[in-house]
A protein has these predicted regions:
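Regulatory N- and C-terminal appendages and interdomain linkers associated
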Residues: 2-116, 381-550
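Conserved oxyanion/phosphate-binding beta-strand-loop segments in alpha/beta enzyme cores
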Residues: 103-161
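Middle-to-C-terminal accessory/interaction subdomains
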Residues: 259-266, 270-309, 316, 323-463
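Short, solvent-exposed loop/turn and secondary-structure capping segments
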Residues: 96-98, 123, 152, 200, ...
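Surface-exposed patches in mature extracellular/periplasmic domains of secreted proteins
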Residues: 154, 180-191, 280-284, 314, ...
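A conserved helix-loop-beta module that forms one wall/lid of the active-site cleft
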Residues: 160-195
Length: 550
């Protein structure tokens, strides 16, 4: 017995030494990460508490080992475009020296592109801990001016920040389909000094070159951010981007004016603050590209994104040729709330600017047309095809992603599939849909009472009635005029509308864009809810033969 015990004690180090090494490594990682991001950085987030970091480190080590074994046994290669970065270890140490502050300064590196190693600068990217507190970090690459990466100089390689992984990637793809200005995006596999870093989302950093690639005139791109370190910039502290132009800066500059020039933005903010005035709304119709803003709002509804809010994620281009503002999609995090139980909203009103626009008839018409066109032209089905393809690709990739977060491939796959179901549900129009013709079949959108050569028209719902067709008792040879009367906050308004004949003069067609009475109920944190009451119009047809009736 003593002999056996001696042998066990003699060889016990074979078991205890690896356990001690692994235990020591995990303990060091836990203490270091907790001290860096919870104690020194002061994140005060539940995820950065010691017990949660301990669970993360253990799960990450298990997943790292499993991913490499899976890749070796199955000989599984990535189906995504590989991005190879080479950064000297000394430069990586500089980035890591005093996180997170040290990570925000560029270090030199190289990038393999088209078979050549090209000089680049590399840093970590993001204002909040989920971008760089974990092993899979978000990175920004900046190329030389003479050596762009496929027409882009600043490239973000973003670590997915949610269990479902694909929120921003699919949001940007949807924006492109809808014709909304957005950065280029792609799913890629990142390799750093030859080591696999897993799946990242490539997102173009919005700069002047974004405009050039979209065939737009170079001009100012205003950036609205008062979150993270941007809370301490000029004009701060404040809880709204729409109180002062001082809290905005530019990521692209019209070189015909000083960089500090922001007169168009000042005008926009003043109009937002006076949005209850009809004159302010008229000016907004002039300085806002309403087709683009209507499409942007439709995009927010289809992604259920309230991430462009009162304090961050604003990118607005001012077109110097047309003197109009155009929205740019940025970090929208589509379907994030729906994945966590939020109910579908037909309208997303998450800030003062959108609250202002929802009081503008031209905007309402443009938004409705964007939604109608999206479904009528089959873009919804085209997008669902993109969703399915992206999810198939991710299911192939996560098994070998060494830094997958959360570090549970089967769990991530289930969440990705759930995201597909959520997107399908939103596009199918849960709870009534986006357009009235997707709603209850017995709902009455418009009704009219006729009186000889005039009518009283009532419009319900939240979308315009664009066309009226009036059948006549007699054919007309000379086109009459339509005079429309309605009540506004300042009193009765009168508008003349053009009239066209159809059916060889037996019918009249009026293109009016008649709206219900829409108001925005202001809620918490500058958000709003669209309320609808019937819109009432009196339409008089002038110039008809006295014997002709509607």
């Amino acid at each position: 017995m003593r002999r056996y015990l001696s042998k066990i004690l003699l060889w016990s180090w074979i078991v205890t030494l690896p356990i001690s090494i692994i235990g020591g490594y995990l303990l060091y990682q836990m203490i270091d990460r907790t001290y860096t991001y919870n104690v020194r950085y002061g994140g005060a987030k539940e995820e950065l508490q010691l017990d949660n970091i301990a669970r993360y480190e253990i799960a990450q080590l298990v997943n790292y080992t499993r991913a490499h074994i899976t890749k070796f046994l199955k000989n599984q290669e990535t189906t995504l475009r590989p991005i190879h970065l080479i950064v000297p270890e000394a430069n990586l140490a500089t980035l890591q020296a005093h996180m997170p502050q040290s990570g925000f300064s560029y270090v030199k590196g190289r990038m393999l592109h088209q078979g050549k190693l090209k000089k680049v600068k590399v840093k970590y990217r993001g204002d909040t801990f989920y971008r760089w507190a974990w092993d899979k970090k978000s990175i920004r690459i900046k190329t030389a001016k003479q050596s762009l990466y496929e027409g882009i100089r600043s490239v973000n390689l973003l670590a997915p920040r949610t269990e479902e992984q694909l929120n921003n990637y699919l949001s940007y793809r949807l924006a492109k389909i809808m014709g909304v200005l957005a950065p280029r995006t792609e799913l890629v596999r990142l390799y750093l000094n030859g080591e696999d870093q897993g799946v990242h989302t490539l997102v173009e950093q919005i700069k002047e070159i974004t405009l050039r690639n979209a065939s737009l005139m170079p001009g100012d791109i205003y950036r609205g951010e008062i979150i993270g370190k941007d809370r301490f910039g000029p004009g701060a502290p404040t809880d709204s981007l729409f109180r002062s132009a001082a809290v905005w800066d530019k990521v692209a500059v019209n070189n015909h004016f000083a960089e500090s020039s922001n007169a168009p933005l000042q005008l926009l903010i003043s109009l937002v603050q006076q949005s209850h005035l009809s004159e302010a709304q008229k000016q907004l119709s002039q300085i806002m590209d309403m087709k683009a803003w209507g499409a942007f709002s439709a995009f927010e509804s289809l992604t259920q994104s309230a991430h462009t809010d009162e304090i961050h994620n604003w990118r607005i281009y001012f077109d110097p040729w047309r003197n109009q503002f155009v929205p740019i999609v940025w970090d929208s995090m589509g379907w994030h709330g729906n994945m966590r139980g939020a109910k579908l909203k037909n309208e997303v009103i998450a800030n003062s600017l959108m609250r202002t626009l929802f009081q503008n008839g031209d905007f309402i018409r443009a938004r409705s047309e964007a939604l109608r066109s999206f479904f009528a032209t089959g873009k919804d089905q085209a997008f669902l095809g993109i969703v399915s393809k992206a999810i198939d690709a991710m299911e192939h990739e996560v098994d070998t992603d060494p830094y997958l977060k959360p570090a549970k491939p089967d769990f991530v796959k289930s969440k990705i599939r759930r995201l597909e179901e959520v997107i399908q549900g939103v596009l199918a129009g849960i709870d009534g849909g986006f357009l009235e013709n997707h709603s209850k079949p017995d709902s009455v959108i418009a009704s009219a009472r006729f009186d000889q050569q005039s009518l009283d028209l009532v419009i319900r719902g939240k979308h315009p009635v664009n066309t009226l067709r009036l059948n006549l008792s007699e054919t007309v040879k000379t086109l009459p005029q339509a005079q429309v009367f309605y009540q506004s906050p300042t009193g009765e308004e009168r508008v003349s509308l053009p009239v066209a004949a159809s059916n060889t003069g037996a019918s009249l067609v009026i293109q009016g864009g008649f709206l219900p009475n829409l108001t925005v109920e202001v809620g918490e944190r500058f958000r709003g809810t669209l309320q609808s009451t019937p819109g009432v119009y009196r339409i008089a047809i002038e110039g008809l033969d006295p014997n002709t009736k509607i």
